[in-house]
A protein has these predicted regions:
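Acidic/glycine-enriched edge-of-secondary-structure segments
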Residues: 49-65, 194-209
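A general structural signal for well-ordered alpha-helical segments in protein cores
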Residues: 45-48, 69, 127
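Mixed-charge interfacial surface used for oligomerization/domain docking
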Residues: 10-24, 28-29, 83, 92, ...
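A short, ordered amphipathic alpha-helix with a cationic face
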Residues: 38, 116-119
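Glycine-rich phosphate- or other oxyanion-binding loops that anchor nucleotides, phosphorylated ligands
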Residues: 55-57, 63-91, 98-99, 144, ...
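N-terminal glycine-rich anion-binding loop in soluble enzyme alpha/beta folds
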Residues: 4-63
Length: 286
């Protein structure tokens, strides 16, 4: 049997898509108003965002435990797989990756753990890249090597409505939030590939300006890597989504779908945020 593909729920691959693609997803925990829920298992992304918008308490998140990883690896092994690739969200953001590595060290399932250095749609595109390689008959070793080589080209651009949640959850400096409020500007942020740090990459007043400034990076990438996949996820942000769609019109890319940002990432970016992800597509040899 071919190797299994495992990811965590911050890849923002919906449960229905995961089932269709034959991908295992381990959920993170979201804690809102004292209730501990499994991301997109016990609460949908849409339900969570609606609840978060009406809550006076800032929700927070927690990684799967070592025991939860063991249970999943046991299930993958019981399904007949001898090996697997696990693609995790950025290890600087969570202990998800380290917990998986800890269990993989002694488990009978041969698990290759890959730190995606990103999250949300960009992580999901890497997962689907691995799946395309598996479907093309590529080996575990080949797939692992190619995914690692592709990591620097998997991009995630986030435009939150405000930086409040990122600051309160320790993902952005407080000064940046204060300055954006004082100057009435919005920031786009993105994970720095080597450090994992969330850094401001663009600024602009109003939705049109911040989207245009942010999409300049995406369009430059598509010019250099035509035919790449682009995925757009949101926690609302209808105006921004329409502006992104307009910016992409006529570009040479593959639409990898739209949908909701999952519960875990939504906790940090807040309501009315948009995530633009892009990554090269796997190209079969023949």
């Amino acid at each position: 049997m071919s190797f299994a593909i495992i990811t965590d729920s911050t890849s923002d691959i919906s449960p229905a898509s995961a089932q269709e693609l034959g991908i295992y997803v381990i959920p993170l925990h979201v804690i809102i108003e004292g209730e501990d829920l499994l991301d997109q298992v016990q609460i949908t992304a849409q339900e969570y965002v609606a609840r978060m918008a009406g809550s006076e308490q800032l929700p927070h998140t927690s990684q799967p435990s070592a025991g939860e990883f063991k249970a999943l690896f046991d299930r993958v092994r019981a399904d007949g797989h001898d090996s697997a690739i696990f693609i995790s969200l950025c290890s600087e953001w969570s202990a998800c990756y380290s917990n998986a590595c800890l269990v993989a060290e002694t488990h009978e399932l041969d698990v290759r753990c890959i730190d995606s250095r990103t999250g949300s749609g960009a992580e999901g595109l890497l997962v689907e890249y691995a799946r395309a390689m598996r479907e093309d008959g590529r080996s575990l070793d080949e797939t692992e090597a190619q995914i690692r080589a592709t990591l620097p080209d998997a991009h995630l651009l986030l435009i939150p409505r405000t930086l409040e949640n990122l600051v309160k959850n320790g993902r952005a400096p407080k000064l940046a939030s204060q300055l954006t409020q004082m100057l009435n500007i919005r920031l786009a942020v993105s994970p720095e590939w080597k450090s994992g740090e969330i850094k401001a990459i663009k600024k602009g007043r109003g939705a049109k300006r911040i989207v245009a400034n942010t999409m300049a990076d995406c369009l430059a990438f598509l010019a250099e890597h035509p035919g790449s996949s682009v995925r757009v996820l949101t926690t609302g942000a209808a105006e921004e989504q329409e502006l992104v769609s307009q910016a992409l019109a006529g570009q040479d890319y593959v639409d990898a779908g739209t949908g909701p940002i999952g519960c875990t990432i939504a906790t940090h970016v807040g309501v009315d945020a948009i995530a633009i992800s892009y990554c090269p597509r796997y190209q079969p040899a023949n």
